[in-house]
């Protein structure tokens, strides 16, 4: 029993050794396959002179595969297929593995397939050269040398790719070119259509300017987005096109007409639309001027209050009224003017003219003082009343159509001698 067990252990040891050996061989072969996959890219021009070298290298590899087959009959087939490596040559082109790595299952089918593509390729190359010479027109030869060189290089690369992966017959070459040209034209048309669609979307996304934007930038140019056929004349109205204001003055006039303000107020810069004139002050000024010039006392008619803008033909005196301070200034000015224009003798002899300065003024209680000359005595009389005077005055005593006796407060007489005359007499005596 012990001997049998020992024999079985020896057999197991031998099997383990064989398994280790096979695993080591597999690892070596896998590392070699990985190195084969890293193919060097072709960076040179493929020429016809190297075709012979390629054919000889392929035939040598096939002969080597048959030798390996004869020697390694005992070994399994999957290990034989990995020994089809070409021997290193002097030329760099032969060192590079042109064919992609593959794992053949049947060696007979591999040999037949490896010989057939080479023969077909050589036939196609010999026929293709003549076809290319016939098809090329004379206009292409007129191109510069660089373009011709680049085209030739591109054609060589295409043929090289066909030798490595697949063998294309000569009859299908022209059809392949036509398909490429049709595909390129379709791509160009699709790109153009996409660009036009993007441009149309951008046009639709644009919005016209609003009225507020035109007020901020009145000189901005507005471009219509619509087509030429839909564009109408500027005079005609169109709901789709925006309103265009070419001048800033027109916009100002439009805003002013809404607010009912005349345009010259904006130029002058006056905030108030109307400048109301005080009728009482105008009347007092006229009466004081007439007294200073020894004219007859005839108060002017009361005029309706009109804005200064409507008084174009009538010269109006503008006053900026501010309570009592303005009245005091006017009184002082009128007194100075009367003293300068009238001599002292005239004031002494004709005291009545000086007393007429107090003909009409504004009182504290808004009472108008009216002074008139009676027809009988030839003296002046004062009448204080709160009633506004009638539009027409005369030298005759007052006649009120409504009951005036209720409104009259006081009536008294003034002597000829005034306090100013007393002062003048005292100065002359001294």
From Swiss-Prot:
Pfam families: DUF4545
InterPro entries: DUF4545
UniProt name for this protein: Uncharacterized protein C1orf141 homolog
């Amino acid at each position: 029993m012990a001997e049998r067990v020992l024999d079985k252990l020896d057999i197991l040891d031998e099997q383990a050794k064989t398994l280790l050996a096979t695993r080591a061989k597999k690892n070596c072969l896998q590392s070699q396959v990985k190195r084969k996959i890293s193919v060097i890219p072709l960076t040179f021009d493929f020429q016809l002179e190297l075709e012979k070298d390629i054919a000889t290298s392929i035939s040598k590899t096939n002969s080597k595969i048959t030798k390996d087959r004869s020697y390694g009959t005992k070994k399994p087939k999957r290990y034989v297929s990995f020994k089809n490596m070409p021997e290193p040559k002097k030329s760099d082109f032969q060192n590079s593995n042109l064919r992609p790595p593959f794992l053949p299952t049947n060696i007979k089918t591999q040999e037949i397939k490896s010989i057939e593509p080479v023969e077909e390729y050589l036939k196609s190359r010999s026929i293709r050269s003549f076809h290319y010479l016939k098809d090329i027109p004379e206009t292409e030869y007129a191109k510069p040398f660089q373009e011709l060189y680049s085209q030739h290089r591109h054609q060589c690369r295409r043929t090289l790719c066909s030798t490595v992966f697949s063998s294309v017959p000569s009859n299908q070459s022209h059809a392949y070119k036509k398909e490429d040209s049709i595909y390129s034209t379709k791509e160009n048309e699709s790109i153009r259509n996409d660009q036009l669609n993007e441009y149309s979307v951008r046009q639709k996304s644009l919005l016209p300017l609003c009225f507020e934007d035109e007020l901020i930038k009145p000189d901005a140019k507005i471009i219509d987005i619509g087509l030429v056929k839909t564009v109408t004349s500027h005079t005609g109205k169109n709901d789709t096109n925006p309103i265009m204001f070419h001048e800033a003055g027109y916009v100002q006039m439009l805003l002013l007409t809404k607010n009912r303000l005349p345009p010259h107020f904006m130029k002058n810069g006056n905030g108030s639309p109307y400048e109301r004139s005080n009728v009482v002050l105008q009347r007092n000024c006229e009466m004081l001027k007439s007294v200073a010039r020894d004219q007859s006392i005839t108060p002017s008619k009361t005029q309706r209050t009109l804005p200064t803008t409507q008084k174009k033909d009538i010269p109006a005196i503008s006053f900026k009224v501010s309570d009592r301070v303005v009245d005091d200034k006017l009184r002082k000015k009128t007194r100075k003017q009367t003293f300068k224009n009238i001599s002292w003798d005239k004031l002494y002899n004709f005291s009545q003219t000086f007393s007429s300065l107090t003909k009409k003024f504004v009182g504290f209680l808004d009472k108008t003082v009216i002074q008139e000359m009676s027809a009988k005595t030839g003296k002046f009389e004062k009448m204080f009343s709160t009633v506004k005077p009638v539009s027409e005055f005369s030298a005759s005593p007052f006649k009120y159509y409504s009951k005036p006796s209720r409104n009259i407060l006081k009536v008294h007489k003034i002597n000829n001698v005034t306090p100013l005359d007393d002062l003048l007499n005292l100065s002359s005596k001294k």
